[in-house]
């Protein structure tokens, strides 16, 4: 009997071994060409909420099947046929503005298009008023409106030129303050559609930076008004007007003052404009209420910090309470992002949250029940959770669950929410939850039927203690397929690195490219430093007046850990673009004892060469912080360079000028250093098409030649 038992146990081991050994390997076509696998499958798509208890979902039985729209009754959990028309909020004919051949057309319901403009000049950023009666736009840097009922055009400003921009942002405001999503638009309708606010920017004193265009027999120069650290900035005025008047009321600010203005806020009734003001040093933020009739202002809020305050909040700093007199404000002044309740006159009522919250987004304010719903990173800095707090600050509850990153969609009345949740080892799932965070129904799982049938590399989130012992630095690491602890492997680290710009997130990420590199034996790493946002503003403040220093110190600590855990110290690669390119260059120079190979794209190499607003926020001006600019410059450490750096840049980059790479190349040549360099003619701060494929191929060949030390397979070519 004993012998039979031993035989049976051995038989089970053999069966288990063979079953485990029968896992399939992903083919080249699946990894590199997007050929079908059933490792994952589509989740139902949330089309929207019909009302507080009915959700519209777009579902597929399998990837090849047609979509079907269903209505989910959240109270019963039952589904019934639905249609996208159920999301329509109004029966009135829709009014859409169409741009054709640089002119504007009105498309109203099923009616033929009506031409609104016919000029040789472009109409830019057409934006309808909230009541759908007007469209505002800019033309040749002046602000216009058209009454969509009468088709009457009104020119609100008349001094637009190459230097005077009305309703159209100067470059530094577009890039650093208002944001790229605005597409240079700097005008805003009031909620009642009775007024329009705009910024007037005067670029007269802003220095010109010439960008060379190689096209044509003689080439040409594109002259950009681009302020560098210490340079004059655009002079900005805030104007307000009614949509059919050219009588502009100017807010009571002195445009010649060294200052910045952030995204303005209209009060919910449209009767006043709140303007964010900041000093040139970016350590004092004030919010003013501006009177629409005479432009007078009164101070509502005043915040000072020893380091800096971020102005580019994209409209998320202030949220008004519409049914009561007050607003909530988000600030990191106590070292973390917390939420505060204020009266409309600016006086503080109470602090709503008091904890280590970061990356907060207000989802909804429920004034009836005196609640605010928001997402934030708190339980774990690599994950996003969903919370509800009472406006009086006495109660707070986490509504999401588990060790997952959550993306939520709250019902209009706050009775239910759906969440898409995942982590680095769990594909996304979709669930319906009630207002107390209790599971109502699982709605979908992206884990496919063949998930367990394929060999896949292991990805995990780990923490490495900083050298000073103060921080547990997060890394996301994908190990080589069939990783063997007794062997040494090459490493490729992908980074960005800027202040509050972390990249390590604990969510499901699966790509054929990632699995390909793992199959080839490459350790793939994303890593964040103490100032990347995982440790609040207290951690970020380390970078004040010292860009490039703490990032490198913490990353060297992580590289030491990698060396002790399977990394080949002679093949430590790092790659990044923009700020990531800067840190790649720093790693190959100041960190040359630890980083051996680098791919640096669109890189800053000296902070004196970047723009005023971004650089001075962290570094102050070169005159105020000469030592910080010196220690933060790649050029300072070129003599330490000893690995292999591949530099690449777009010739018409209007963000990080190619001047940066040229100055680095010059210094490398002066020091007789070997490096690689590639330019992309006409490329801006990024490029597409064949240039993008060429760039990818060249970078992949660099990895094969220097890290994997073998020829790149033809299957990798794009």
Regions found by a protein language model. Name each.
Residues 36-41, 123-125, 163-182, 256-261, ...:
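Short glycine-/Asp-/Thr-/Trp-enriched loop segments that recur within the blades
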Residues 74-87, 156-188, 195-250, 437-449, ...:
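Predominantly five- to eight-bladed beta-propeller fold
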Residues 208, 263-265, 270, 405-718:
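Serine-hydrolase catalytic core recognition
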Residues 1-27:
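Bacterial Sec-dependent N-terminal signal peptides
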Residues 74-75, 108-111, 148-151, 242-246, ...:
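Short loop/turn segments that connect beta-strands within beta-propeller blades
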Residues 44-47, 53, 58-63, 67-69, ...:
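Non-catalytic accessory segments flanking enzyme active sites
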Residues 56-62, 93-103, 107-108, 135-142, ...:
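Beta-strand C-termini and the immediately following turn/loop, strongest in propeller blades
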Residues 199-349:
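Beta-propeller domains
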């Amino acid at each position: 009997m004993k012998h039979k038992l031993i035989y049976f146990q051995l038989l089970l081991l053999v069966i288990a071994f063979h079953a485990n050994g029968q896992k399939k390997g992903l083919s080249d076509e699946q990894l590199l060409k997007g050929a079908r696998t059933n490792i994952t499958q589509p989740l139902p798509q949330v089309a929207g909420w019909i009302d507080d208890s009915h959700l519209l979902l777009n579902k597929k039985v399998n990837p090849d099947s047609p979509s079907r729209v269903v209505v989910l009754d959240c109270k019963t959990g039952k589904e019934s046929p639905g249609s996208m028309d159920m999301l329509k909020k109004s029966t009135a004919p829709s009014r859409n503005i169409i741009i054709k051949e640089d002119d504007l057309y009105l498309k109203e319901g099923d009616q033929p298009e009506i031409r609104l403009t016919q000029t040789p000049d472009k109409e830019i950023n057409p934006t309808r008023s909230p009541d759908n009666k007007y469209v505002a736009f800019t033309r040749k840097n002046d602000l216009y409106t058209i009454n969509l009922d009468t088709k009457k055009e009104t020119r609100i400003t008349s001094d637009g030129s190459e230097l005077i921009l009305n309703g159209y942002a100067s470059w530094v405001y577009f890039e650093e303050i208002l944001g790229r999503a605005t597409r240079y638009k700097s005008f805003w309708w009031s909620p009642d559609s009775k007024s329009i606010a705009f910024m007037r920017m005067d670029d007269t004193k802003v220095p010109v930076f010439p960008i060379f265009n190689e096209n044509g027999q003689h080439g040409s120069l594109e002259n950009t008004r681009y302020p560098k650290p210490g340079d004059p900035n655009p002079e900005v005025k805030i104007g307000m007007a009614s949509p059919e008047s050219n009588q502009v009321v100017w807010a009571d600010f002195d445009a010649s003052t060294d200052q910045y203005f952030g995204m303005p806020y209209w009060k919910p009734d449209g009767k006043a404009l709140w303007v964010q003001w900041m000093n040139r040093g970016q350590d004092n933020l004030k919010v003013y209420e501006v009177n629409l009739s005479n432009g007078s202002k009164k101070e509502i809020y005043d915040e000072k910090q020893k380091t800096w305050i971020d102005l580019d909040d994209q409209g998320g700093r202030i949220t008004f309470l519409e049914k009561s007199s007050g607003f909530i404000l988000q600030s990191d002044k106590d070292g973390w992002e917390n939420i505060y309740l204020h009266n409309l006159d600016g006086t503080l009522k109470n602090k709503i949250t008091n904890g280590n919250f970061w990356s907060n987004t207000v989802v909804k304010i429920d004034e009836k029940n005196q609640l605010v719903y928001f997402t934030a990173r708190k339980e774990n800095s690599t994950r996003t959770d969903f919370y509800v707090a009472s406006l009086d600050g006495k109660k707070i509850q986490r509504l999401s669950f588990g060790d997952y990153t959550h993306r939520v969609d709250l019902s209009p009345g706050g009775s239910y929410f759906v969440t898409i949740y995942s982590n680095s080892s769990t594909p996304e799932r979709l669930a319906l939850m009630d207002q107390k965070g209790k599971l109502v129904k699982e709605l979908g799982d992206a884990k496919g039927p063949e998930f367990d049938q394929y060999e896949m590399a292991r990805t995990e989130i780990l923490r490495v203690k900083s050298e000073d012992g103060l921080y547990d630095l997060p890394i996301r690491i994908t190990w080589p397929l069939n990783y063997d602890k007794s062997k040494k492997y090459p490493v490729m680290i992908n980074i960005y690195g800027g202040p509050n710009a972390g990249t390590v997130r604990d969510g499901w990420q699966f790509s054929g490219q990632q699995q390909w590199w793992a199959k080839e034996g490459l350790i793939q790493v994303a890593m964040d430093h103490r100032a990347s946002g995982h440790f609040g503003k207290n951690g970020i403040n380390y970078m004040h007046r010292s860009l490039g220093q703490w990032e490198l110190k913490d990353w060297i600590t992580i590289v030491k850990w990698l060396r002790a855990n399977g990394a080949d110290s002679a093949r430590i690669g790092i790659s990044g673009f923009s700020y990531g390119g800067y840190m790649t260059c720093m790693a190959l120079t100041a960190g040359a004892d630890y980083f051996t190979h680098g791919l640096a794209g669109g890189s800053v190499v000296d902070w004196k060469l970047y723009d005023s607003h971004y650089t001075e926020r962290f570094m102050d001006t070169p005159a105020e912080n000469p030592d910080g600019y010196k220690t933060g410059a790649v050029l300072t450490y070129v003599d330490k360079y000893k690995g292999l750096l591949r530099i690449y840049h777009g010739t018409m980059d209007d963000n990080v000028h190619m001047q940066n790479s040229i100055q680095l190349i010059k210094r490398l040549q002066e020091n007789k250093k070997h490096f690689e360099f590639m330019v992309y003619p006409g490329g801006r701060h990024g490029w597409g098409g064949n240039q993008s494929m060429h760039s990818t191929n060249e970078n992949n060949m660099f990895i094969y030649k220097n890290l994997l030390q073998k020829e790149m397979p033809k299957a990798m070519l794009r």
